Swiss-Prot record:
Keywords: ATP-binding, Isopeptide bond, Kinase, mRNA processing, mRNA splicing, Nucleotide-binding, Nucleus, Phosphoprotein, Serine/threonine-protein kinase, Transferase, Ubl conjugation. Residues 1-13, 87-106, 120-134, 142-163, 184-195, 226-235, 428-455, 479-526, 654-666 have a biased composition (Basic and acidic residues). Residues 1-455, 471-611, 623-703, 1052-1103, 1163-1264 are annotated as: Disordered. GO terms for molecular function: ATP binding; cyclin binding; cyclin-dependent protein serine/threonine kinase activity; protein serine kinase activity; RNA polymerase II CTD heptapeptide repeat kinase activity. It is found in: Nucleus; Nucleus speckle. Belongs to the protein kinase superfamily. CMGC Ser/Thr protein kinase family. CDC2/CDKX subfamily. The modification Phosphoserine is found at residues 236, 249, 265, 274, 276, 301, 303, 310, 312, 318, 323, 325, 332-334, 338, 341, 343, 345, 383, 385, 400, 420, 423, 614, 644, 681, 685, 889, 1055, 1085. Cyclin-dependent kinase that phosphorylates the C-terminal domain (CTD) of the large subunit of RNA polymerase II (POLR2A), thereby acting as a key regulator of transcription elongation. Regulates the expression of genes involved in DNA repair and is required for the maintenance of genomic stability. Preferentially phosphorylates 'Ser-5' in CTD repeats that are already phosphorylated at 'Ser-7', but can also phosphorylate 'Ser-2'. Required for RNA splicing, possibly by phosphorylating SRSF1/SF2. This is Cyclin-dependent kinase 12. The gene is CDK12. PANTHER family: CELL DIVISION PROTEIN KINASE (PTHR24056), CYCLIN-DEPENDENT KINASE 12 (PTHR24056:SF126). The active site is at residue 859. Residues 528-571, 670-685 have a biased composition (Pro residues). It comes from Bos taurus (Bovine). Interacts with CCNL1 and CCNL2.
Length: 1264
């Protein structure tokens, strides 16, 4: 609808107001000349426009060509960073553009009217003549524009308003035309009544708007403008938002190209021309604004944020833009808002795209957008450097003063020129309002340029809805302020476009209403005095209700409320306020009349509205720079407005809805400012809301992270939240690769836990990878046979930089009393077949669970299999575990698994191994449970492979086809070929057939033929095991048997030092005897007698005491001791005979070794107790009849007696002789039992020492 009107130059000429008609008549020749120039200069201007767009600052872009000088100033102050064009070059280009721009404006207007092409040829001569005049006037204006920026636009406006009078009152007309351009923007919005004038103005202004659009500075300042030039870009919210966000030369260049294309296309030029009439007003407005351009740019420096926001927000709807236009400026000051607006803008801008999608609207919008782009670009500049605002405002104040004077002269000239042009009432109003706006609104324009545009846009909406659309597009590109205006206008525009020119009045009213809200918001943000400043009391009266209620209720009144905001800025600019205030009442009345009579009073209303808007905008802008965060709420509103205006004509309600929606979006978004977003009533109290929202978002941000903590709490309660001081450390029970393991008690629950320390002081790369891997895997493994990690605690309450503080973390596990290695080495327990079945069943269930979860343990050994006193088995230490993918068959390191439990494929260099490696390790443990010793104990990989080959046969292709593929098959061959003897060897250990068969399958050389964990559970040995019916093993409750404890005892024994740990009395005695006896056993080589003497070195006093004790023992006590020895001794018949008949050192030592093996309690403190309490063993034996009690006493006696080889021999001889004499049958039984037990136990003890060494080496390999 608006497009055809815009395109119809005749319609515009005839239907336009008198002001517009006169310029068209007088400017017909000028338009034709401009067209001619456009034809010739379009190409030049494309390049120049691309340059000029970069050169022309946002001021020039929004305000018109007149703004270019200001743009120069602003470019230096705020836009220099964003726009790289030189100021001098910009000035020259601006001058050229102004000269050409006036011609272009006329040409473009005619192009838009489609008469442009036809009249080009006819008017070429006229245009050339008029162009000369215009050039002369534009030159003078451009010079003035350079000086004040107002004369430049006055020339452009002169061209737009009347080329005949342009030469006379180029300066006056430039100012009036600037005001007129702003009015024309309103007229565009009010296009229905103002179509003719706007079209003629467009023709005249098109060059200006074109210049502004093409001016490199404008483009550079407002990438949105560039985007706006291209309808797609303008429409695309992303494009606008991008432009706002990125004031980049590339967008500018693109814009320039778009502009050039528009210039080239007559249709596009005509559209832009139709848009340019609003530009005209902005041109005059810009000329006045030019003087305040520093302020406007400064405000824009704040507005840049608003601009960015407004770009997206305004695109969707200018409602939010207007009401928040001051806010938008303030928003512009807040970068968060601008970003948010961008994020939101895409949807609204897309909606605006719909209206823009109409090609005529697009082109017109693009040209009006170029104007708005100018203002938007200024706001962008502010967004680029909001800090520059104050500097610009101070400089701008001086410039505005000078420009005010120029504006006054230009306004007078404009009034005269415009009156002569044929719209004396409209133009004088424009001149008065524009002059006053310039005087009072120069600074305001700078700050509230977006607001002014909004206000002017409503008037233009009345004049031309299509212009509104173009303006909306332009405003989207221009800046957030303009975007806000456009967003408000744009919803109306869409509706009006659909409705038609008739609807333009309501649309204009709506837009005006939106603008009043924005004005109100800006006023509220600014200060209560602003409304007071508003000179027109009637307007405030009308204004207050619109301001208080949401946008919808204020359709007509908003225009008035805009006026009240105007006066408050006026006080800020006292000079400008005085002139604009006087003009404001008429302008307010004209605006009201505009609402009532759209066509006739639209021009005057536009002028007055522009003046009001400028004043109001100026006030918000000043406040905006003061309150950068406040703009955020309006942007939110703008977003809301953008969405709903597109959807529905009622811009005010839509704004609220959209504001709410943006809030949700903002809440979702990480941007803190948007979250609060003044959703409840941004128009009423935008400042507080704007301030509050940023706080809310910050509060909400931690909440965003809360779910993660919540997830942790769900799976693991408060991991990492507690400190290790919540536990009472009882003692060290183990040592890991990255720290110690402590037994501790939870102070809160009294529960026993194991704290695995993760040290960070030795880590070069932070948290140890093994700990990370273990934590990650254990959190995924929940099984009764897998150790449970309860939580993670820190060693410092504040948990600051642990790396710097050499702090540590602690993995909190459920406490297990023993590990299998400690139990087997302690000799305190003898596992029955049922116990072995239970242990293996639980172990294989846990391993099968891990394998089914695709995890390889890769470190199964006795020390990593934990037991509690109830006989429950748990698989622990997942530091080497990793996720296994059977499909990818990727290589893994083969330096895993302790050497004694390492399968042959790893020894031969296999890197693509399978879960079968864990099954081999479990097979080794099964054999160890029966033999009481590791079955493969070697210290080197080659030796380990040799031991495996002796028992399981040499690896060869016959039994293992793939072995030849392994890297070390040729280098690590056994010394000779061995046959498999596993069943034969283990048959001596009286293994059950089921266990032997299972062991044979688990220790198969070929991993592909090795049974799986699931198959082991189905074996005859384990399938019928019912754990619930199993009796718990008789484990030592008085002593926790862990690897560390057993290693300590072993080292002490090897060094000849008695165990120093003081266990309970019983435990200590047992440990003492077993310690002395076990030490010789471990150290003893094939010739046990030799090692024993060296190891047993108690004091002579002790030996004597023991001798006395043994003599004091009665036969009953000896019988008890004999019974104990019968059940747990490894003595053989020949040994007993030797002891009885021959008292040689070797035999005595052998007996001592046998006793040590049979008695399996070792304690570090036995030596102390032995010295201090030589008689204690005796008493304990007497008091305690059970075998365990007697056993400790015997153990203690043995170490005491073994002070020297002679003493030991004597003591043993006496003891054994007495025992044998008194109880020969018992001795026979003892010998028989020893025969049975000696086989398995003797071998187990022997490898203990190598086992430890190998373990140490293996650990080193694992760590690598």
């Amino acid at each position: 609808m608006p497009n055809p009107e815009r395109h119809g130059g005749k319609k515009d000429g005839s239907g336009g107001a008198s002001g517009t008609l006169q310029p068209s008549s007088g400017g017909g020749s000028s338009n034709s000349r401009e067209r001619h120039r456009l034809g010739s200069k379009h190409k030049r201007h494309k390049s120049k426009h691309s340059k000029d767009m970069g050169l022309v600052t946002p001021e020039a872009a929004p305000l018109g060509t007149v703004i270019k000088p200001l743009v120069e100033y602003d470019d230096i102050s705020s836009d220099s960073d964003t726009f790289s064009d030189d100021l001098a070059f910009k000035v020259d280009r601006r001058e050229n553009d102004e000269r050409r721009g006036t011609d272009r404006s006329d040409r473009l207007h005619k192009h838009r009217h489609h008469q442009h092409r036809r009249t080009r040829d006819l008017l070429k001569t006229k245009q050339t003549e008029k162009e000369k005049n215009l050039e002369a006037s534009s030159k003078s204006g451009s010079t003035k524009d350079r000086i004040s920026g107002s004369s430049k636009r006055s020339n452009e406006e002169n061209d737009d308003h009347g080329k005949a009078q342009i030469s006379k009152s180029s300066n006056k007309e430039s100012r009036s035309s600037k005001l007129h351009k702003e009015k024309t923007r309103k007229e565009r919005e009010l296009k229905s009544g103002h179509k003719d004038r706007s079209k003629s103005h467009r023709k005249r202004e098109t060059p200006k708007s074109y210049k502004t659009v093409d001016s490199p500075k404008r483009r550079s300042r407002s990438p949105h403008r560039k985007w706006s030039d291209s309808p797609k870009q303008d429409d695309s919210p992303s494009g606008a938002s991008y432009g706002q966000d990125y004031d980049l030369s590339p967008p500018r260049s693109h814009t320039s190209s778009n502009y050039d294309s528009y210039k080239k296309s007559p249709g596009s030029t005509s559209r832009r021309q139709s848009i340019s009439p609003p530009y005209k007003e902005p041109s005059a407005y810009q000329s006045s604004t030019r003087s305040p351009s520093p302020y406007s740019r400064r405000q824009r420096s704040v507005s840049p944020y608003s601009r960015r926001r407004s770009s997206s927000y305004e695109r969707s709807g200018s409602y939010s833009g207007r009401s928040p236009s001051p806010y938008g400026r303030r928003r512009s000051s807040s970068p968060f808002l601008s970003k948010r607006s961008l994020s939101r803008s895409p949807l609204p801008s897309r909606k605006s795209m719909k209206s823009r999608s109409r090609s005529p609207a697009y082109s017109r919008h693009s040209s009006s957008h170029s104007k708005k782009k100018r203002s938007g670009s200024r706001s962008r500049h502010s967004s680029i450097s909001p800090v520059r605002l104050p500097l610009n405002s101070s400089l701008g104040a001086e410039l505005s003063r000078k420009k005010k004077e120029r504006a006054a002269a230009a306004a007078a000239a404009k009034m005269d020129g415009k009156e002569s042009k044929g719209s004396p009432i409209f133009l004088p109003k424009k001149e008065n309002s524009s002059v006053e706006a310039k005087d009072s609104g120069l600074e305001p324009k700078k700050l509230p340029r977006g607001v002014k545009l909004e206000k002017s846009a409503p008037d233009t909406e009345l004049v031309n809805v299509t212009h509104l659309n173009t303006e909306v597009k332009n405003s989207l590109d221009t800046g957030k302020v303009k975007l806000d205006e456009n967003s408000e206008k744009h919803p109306v525009l869409k509706d009006t476009k659909v409705q038609g020119t008739k609807d333009s009045k309501p649309v204009a009213l709506k837009e005006e209403i939106v603008t009043p809200k924005e004005t109100e918001t800006s006023e509220k943000e600014t200060l209560p005095p602003l409304p007071t400043v508003t000179s027109p009391p009637p307007l405030p009266t009308t204004t207050p209700p619109p301001q208080t209620p949401p946008l919808p209720p204020l359709p007509p009144l908003p225009a008035i409320p805009q006026q009240p905001p105007l006066p408050p800025p006026q006080p800020t600019f006292s000079q400008v306020l005085s002139s604009s205030t006087s003009t404001l009442p008429p302008s307010v009345h004209p605006r009201t009349s505009t609402l009532s009579s759209q066509a006739n009073s639209q021009p005057s209303v536009q002028v007055s509205v522009k003046t009001q808007v400028s004043v109001t905008a100026a006030i918000p802008h000043l406040k905006t720079s003061t309150l950068p965060p406040l703009p955020l709420p309006p942007l939110l509103l703008g977003d809301d407005d953008m969405d709903s205006p597109k959807e529905t004509l009622p811009s005010k309600p839509v704004k609220k809805e959209k504001e709410q929606r943006p809030r949700h979006l903002l809440t979702d978004l990480p941007l803190p400012p948007e979250l609060p977003g003044g959703d409840p009533s941004p128009p009423d109290s935008p400042e507080p809301k704007a301030i509050t929202p940023p706080q809310q978002p910050y509060k909400k941000r931690p909440k965003i992270c809360c779910p993660r903590y919540g997830e942790r709490r769900q799976t693991e309660s408060d991991w990492g939240k507690r400190c290790v001081d919540k536990f009472d450390i009882i003692g060290i029970i183990g040592e890991g690769t990255y720290g110690q393991v402590y037994k501790a008690k939870d102070k809160d629950t009294g529960e026993l836990v194991a704290l695995k320390k993760v040290r960070l002081d030795n880590e070069k790369e932070g948290f140890p990878i093994t700990a990370i891997r273990e934590i990650k895997i254990l959190r995924q493994l929940i099984h009764r046979s897998v150790v449970n990690m309860k939580e993670i605690v820190t060693d410092k309450q504040d948990a600051l930089d642990f790396k710097k503080d050499k702090g540590a973390f602690y993995l909190v596990f459920e406490y297990m009393d023993h590990d299998l290695m400690g139990l087997l080495e302690s000799g305190l327990v003898h596992f029955s077949e049922d116990h072995i079945k239970s242990f293996m069943k639980q172990l294989m269930e846990g391993l099968d669970y891990c394998h089914k979860k695709n995890f390889l343990h890769r470190d199964i050994k006795c020390s990593n299999i934990l037991l509690n006193n109830s006989g429950q088995i748990k698989l622990a230490d997942f530091g080497l575990a990793r996720l296994y993918n059977s499909e990818e068959s990727r290589p893994y390191t083969n330096k895993v698994i302790t050497l004694w439990y390492r399968p042959p494929e790893l020894l031969l260099g296999e890197e693509r191994y399978t879960p079968a490696i864990d099954v081999w390790s479990c097979g080794c443990i099964l054999g160890e449970l029966f033999t009481k010793k590791p079955i493969f104990q070697a210290n080197l990989e080659l030796a380990q492979l040799e031991l495996i080959s002796r028992l399981c046969g040499s690896p060869c292709p016959a039994v293992w086809p793939d072995v030849i593929k392994l890297p070390y098959f040729n280098t690590m061959k056994p010394k000779k070929q061995y046959r498999r003897r596993l069943r034969e060897e283990f048959s001596f250990f009286f293994l059950p057939w089921g266990a032997l068969d299972l062991l044979d399958h688990m220790l198969t050389l070929d991993p592909s033929k090795r049974c799986t964990a699931e198959q082991t559970l189905q074996s005859d040995f384990l399938k019928d095991v019912e754990l619930s019916k199993m009796d718990p093993p008789d484990l030592p409750h008085w002593q926790d048997c862990h690897e560390l404890w057993s290693k300590k005892r072993r080292r002490q024994r090897q060094s000849g030092v008695l165990v120093e740990e003081p266990p309970p009395p019983k435990a200590s005695r047992k440990e003492t005897i077993s310690g002395t006896s076990a030490e010789p056993v471990k150290n003893s080589s094939p010739a046990p007698p030799q090692p024993a003497p060296g190891k047993v070195e108690p004091g002579a006093g002790d030996a004597i005491g023991l001798g006395d004790i043994t003599q004091q023992l009665n036969q009953s006590e000896l019988a008890v001791l004999l019974n104990l020895l019968q059940s747990q001794t490894d003595l053989s018949i020949p040994q007993m005979a030797q002891l009885l008949n021959i008292h040689s050192n070797p035999e005595m030592q052998q007996q001592l070794e046998a006793l040590n093996q049979s008695i399996s309690a070792l304690t570090a403190a036995t030596s102390q107790q032995q010295d201090s309490e030589p008689t204690a063993p005796e008493e304990s034996l007497k008091e305690i009849a059970p075998a365990p009690a007697v056993q400790p006493s015997a153990e203690q006696t043995t170490p005491e007696a073994s002070s020297t080889p002679a003493d030991m021999q004597n003591m043993l001889a006496v003891l054994l002789s007495q025992l044998m004499k008194t109880q020969e049958p018992a001795g026979n039984l003892e010998e028989n039992n020893s025969d049975k037990n000696s086989g398995p136990q003797g071998p187990r003890r022997t490898p203990t020492m190598p086992q430890e060494e190998a373990a140490g080496k293996q650990t080193g390999h694992e760590s690598h």
